[in-house]
């Protein structure tokens, strides 16, 4: 220690701090030189190794800590490696999917920049998709690309027609003559060839011709099928069906003498020979699958062995690119080969344990058994081979390279033998289930089979599809069917090479067993490189897949069994592959027994067409493969798929030889070409300095304008939208773009107007602009005058101000205007109130009596009134706010989805907002509606029910009833029709307080009751407002508040009737649709939508109110979903219909739609009927005419309902049943309107039309000879005539006593005369004095169908048949006490801040 101190010179540096600690140093020295420490001499290497081995062996001792820790480490390591592997596979799959998307999007038409950023966007959503779903998604994108191309082509066509319109509009009035346009379309239609005419739409028929332009006799009695919108559509369809029926009947006759098993095979194989592109048939034929009908001689127990049944199971032969494997499959223990990650295959099993041979590599063919020992190929007339198998169960043989091995199995379940390399061996397996044998490298195995049936001498030899072939096996009593060439479905299996594991296994497993019966059994799958690589969607150069094609369904048999499984053992193999293998689900249908086999359905497109007959499409052009995308085949699956699914074929970037500009005309052509005349005139007035005080008012009500962007149909002229749509409807979707060019060229050459016509058109345009300008000015001056928003002006006040015009010089002239106008009846105070429309009419009459140009005089009068009405800035702001609030009530009604709840809510919100903002009050309010007093008539004929109120008053007011014998002033308001204001309710003795818990000291406030009036000034309810909850001592309503509350009552009345008018229209639509479905069968669904204004940038939206299916079951949405224009680019035909107010025929998603507008009285569309007719190109002519009848009746009913609610027409009661109530009347208006039209049409008939029916039975022999009608048909026609006439006679009320004993037809004939016709033309079947034997009439009519009546082709029978059915329907409805169809009820929302009654008012108004 001292030596260290001296060495470090620590003694000389005593004053310097140091880190040297002598104690620590001394201790360390002593520890290092401890004499008692003995150093370990060490161990040998042998001892060290043995010790390590011992420690390692301890980990294998069960139930020890080391053992458990070792197992945990192994599992952790295994899971970590698995996660790393899965992550690597996901990266590979994501890369390949991205590449597939990039290749797929080359199908889309690119914009000028040549980029589609959506590829990157979609890539983030497909990461977790299964392989099958991803391929279906790719196919969906293919069809979307095809539809997108069609949209571009349609946009190009519409742009060409728009340019044509501008060229033909030489006067620049933005209108073309409609009749001249239709005449040119007829001329172009007539000069076209028959082939072209079959693709065009007939311009002489509806929808080109309106119902008002068709005579009644022609509308109801024209049954000439040649006048269909598609020329000879019915005849062509009937001819095709007859040819198919004859072909099928001949085939059945040929097979009658064949054995049952062979006959079934022939039928089933024949059904697969037809093209799989049929798109127009019944719902059973919409999927591209066909049921095979190979059947045995009987049904045996499912679990009996092959030896007991004397038959073996069938097999599914699945062939790879360079090898093929035979698969034996049973009904209960069959197996299915499933390949790769996320691949699945479905195998159909018959009730006789039959089998289906399927083969791949872009073709379908029968798999010929390999040239090995003991195999016999048996071929049928359809070149199908059947090979008999020994009594073994479920064995699978796999083929190597030019060697074969047999696998013998005992009666176990689903075992599979695994083979070695380059040698043939037989392995017997027992007591094993679900094992999978796979072979390493290029070897093929063939199952040895003992021939049990001789080869058919008439069978043809099967050509070899590849160098190696699979086999088809079947038992002696169980048949299998396979179709050659393109007439057979196949299962294509392709495998890739895989490395052999070091442990000696045959290779990592790529396939998984999929159980069909007892979920036991398997199919061995082998891997190997193929001669041709195929995939449902090709990702890269090394990509392969299993492709299994479904068959076309020819019978509705059992449902398809599809099983999809994911093989967990396939994940290690993916690491060795450079590309992902995809597989397509094989869809096979079950085989039915002979007893249950239905007749094959007729497919239109299976008929061989005549060489002279043009190929007329009978289905939608834009049709996808039938069924959902899941049922369709993927692009690239096979050669036949690519031929059928043209949407998945490569497409050029040019459309009709032109590169797309990247812009759509339909998106902005309204801005460029379509201008609102009202907006233009409003802009001109706002630029005029003479009307400065009206500018703010005009801007306000232009902002609050309702629905914009619709063209009204006027029947005289066509604007740009209507012209383009008319031409687009004419050319249809099946014509070429060149035909549209020819049509445009034809129009440009032949459309011309004379000088007088141009001058007349310009004059009409000027008058229209002047009329709109006058209306805007008068509406603005009315709103400025009505500063408090009451909705009315006092006539005396208006006269007093008008008479001062020009210092009274025009006083006498103005008084003359009162002689030409009918003012409303004066109120009890002798005041005449003018509404906005009445005020405008009155001023126009006053101006017409003054000297000078009417437009200049009117502007002078408006300028005078504007200067005479002085309003302060505060009054102007208050007027602006109140106008906005009143508009919100109407807006709530228009966007309510036919519900009153939003109207009630918005009404109370407006009342409370105005009371707080302009009166500094807290109010309570409730709405009472008049109802008929049914239960207590002694307390008054009517009662007032509180249907809505503010939330605080709900426990005391809501749903309470006020009778006439109770205290209150509400019935006084109802009787007098004017508001009543009680300033202090505590001093009034006739006020009824709903809250009985309130003390009399709290009865401090004002009460105001206002009448609710309809368009005819009839009272239907009361709006009550009070200030009992206001804390202020003085809370009296001021005059401007009372006037505004009158405006609120008026706005609520308008909104209330708006909702109920739409509700009644919806009620009538439902009735009409149900009638249509009762007489037609070709319509799938009918969707009813109403137009509503939009709060967004769009002009309007559609609300899906109701969907009715073919059974007449209607789904009514209480909260209807909204359809926006931007969200339905592939279904834009709905908005085309509402934009133009014209009928649209379009295709969407492979289905044909007929979009029919529901027009309001201004001829603008207020709704739409979307008629879906499925995959048919068009309805039959009879159904098409019945659709027209339904549409015409609904439109007439809508005009009547809307006119009654708006006050434009008076309500008329035609039949007695209409007085039963508003709701019930709305439900029968459709039948009443049809009854009226039928009676009017019967009156137009000549007497000889009825006489010819009486003589029909005497000339039936002549008809049978001249018209080539069989005797049975003539007798059926005679029975039809007799029964219809008997049914009509039974409605006669003049001689009903003499009709009871009639038995022979000779006695019935005496009652058919002109008096009977006159009687049925005015008969009211619902009258109380009309007595009809309904059961007897029904017995005569119900035996005859609608089709039978139509085929008779007689207008009298047609009219009488409909007349009888309508009368019976009205009688049935009249006998019911309740309403058979209830319109949608107002929804009740829990989030509403106002209370609304859940019970519906009957609304029986006085």
UniProtKB/Swiss-Prot annotation:
GO molecular function, one term: calcium ion binding
Record keywords, A-Z: Calcium, Metal-binding
Regions of compositional bias (Acidic residues) in chain numbering: 564-577
InterPro entries (alphabetical): EF_Hand_1_Ca_BS (IPR018247), EF_hand_dom (IPR002048), GAF-like_dom_sf (IPR029016)
Positions with biased composition (Polar residues): 258-294, 322-334, 342-354, 362-373, 382-393, 402-414, 422-434, 442-464
Residues bound to Ca(2+): 786, 788, 790, 797
PROSITE patterns referenced in this protein's UniProt entry, alphabetically: EF_HAND_1, EF_HAND_2
Superkingdom of origin: Eukaryota
Domain EF-hand stretches: 773-808
Region (Disordered) residue spans: 255-655
Compositionally biased tracts (Basic and acidic residues): 465-477, 578-598, 638-655
Biased composition regions of type Low complexity, renumbered to the chain: 501-513
Record protein name field: EF-hand calcium-binding domain-containing protein 5
Organism: Mus musculus
Chain's gene name: Efcab5
